[in-house]
Structures are given as structure tokens and as C-alpha cells.
Amino acid sequence: MYKKIEIFTDGSCLGNPGPGGCAAILRYKQHKKEFSIGYRLTTNNRMELMAAIIALESLKNPCQIILNTDSQYLLHGITQWIHIWKKHHWKTSEEKLVKNIDLWQRLDVAIQIHSIIHWNWLKSHTGHPDNERCDQLARLAAKCPINEDFY
């Protein structure tokens, strides 16, 4: 039987590009774990992707996951576009490499071990406690970036 994990993610960027942060909250029964990390120069979309990546990579065993995000970019990318990109060797319809290909490929690997992942969109800033907490953690991480990134 797989553990049922609920994940909340968010990314933040102070300027776009600029310093950024990402955060994730993982819930399993009564347990809760928070992650956040800041980058010196990045974009909002890269931070949304990194939030999901750090959450999924923290899980060492296959799980059933509900991943909540307020990012349409992440949601549409992982549920619709990624299949097309992979089929076309990570190129867009204009024959250009997919933006943030490094993170999309990393996310693609991270989702492979899990039995079920349900991707759920949450409207941001509507008062959901875990979504609001992720937003707060991501903004704090963006204010104190410790890692290099590139966009």
C-alpha cells in the first residue's frame, strides 16, 4: 500500500528575472514537512518548477500524491505539454528547445517513481493555509538567496 501524500508548492521571484525562492509543504497523516530554498538570479516559472521538484525528490519511496499548485504554467506543462515535448525531442511547435528544459526533464524523472500523481490547481491568495504558508516561505527564501541559478 502506498502512502498518500498531499503536497503544496509555490514559487516567488523578486523581479523576473531576479532573486527567487521556492517552497513546498508535504503532509502525510498528521505529519508535516516544509522545504524552501532561494536562488540569486532566476525566474518565477523556474521557481514554480523547482518547488514541485524539491517536494517530489524528497520522497524516496513510491507514493500516491496530490500536488497542489497555483501555477498554471506548472499544471499545464506537466499534464498537457510535456507529452508533446517528449514526443518532439523537447522542442516546441516552432522547433525551439522548450524553456526551462533542464527543470522539465528533472521533474519528468521525479514523477516516474510514484504510483499516482493528481495535479490540482489552487487559486492563489484565497486563504488556504498551506498555500499561503508556501507563498510566505517562497518569498522569504527569495529575500535570502543562497544558490546560483540561471534563466
Curated annotation (Swiss-Prot):
Catalyzed reactions per annotation: Endonucleolytic cleavage to 5'-phosphomonoester
Start and end residues of each RNase H type-1 domain: 1-143
Cofactor(s), by name: Mg(2+)
Predominant place of localization: cytoplasm
Keywords assigned by UniProt, alphabetized: Cytoplasm, Endonuclease, Hydrolase, Magnesium, Metal-binding, Nuclease
UniProt-recorded Gene Ontology molecular function terms: magnesium ion binding; nucleic acid binding; RNA-DNA hybrid ribonuclease activity
The name this protein goes by in its record: Ribonuclease H
Known function: Endonuclease that specifically degrades the RNA of RNA-DNA hybrids.
Record-listed E.C. numbers: 3.1.26.4
Sequence positions that bind Mg(2+) 1: 10, 48, 70
Disulfide bond positions: none
Residues annotated for Mg(2+) 2 binding in this entry: 10, 135
Biological process per Gene Ontology, one example term: DNA replication, removal of RNA primer
Family annotation (Pfam families): RNase_H
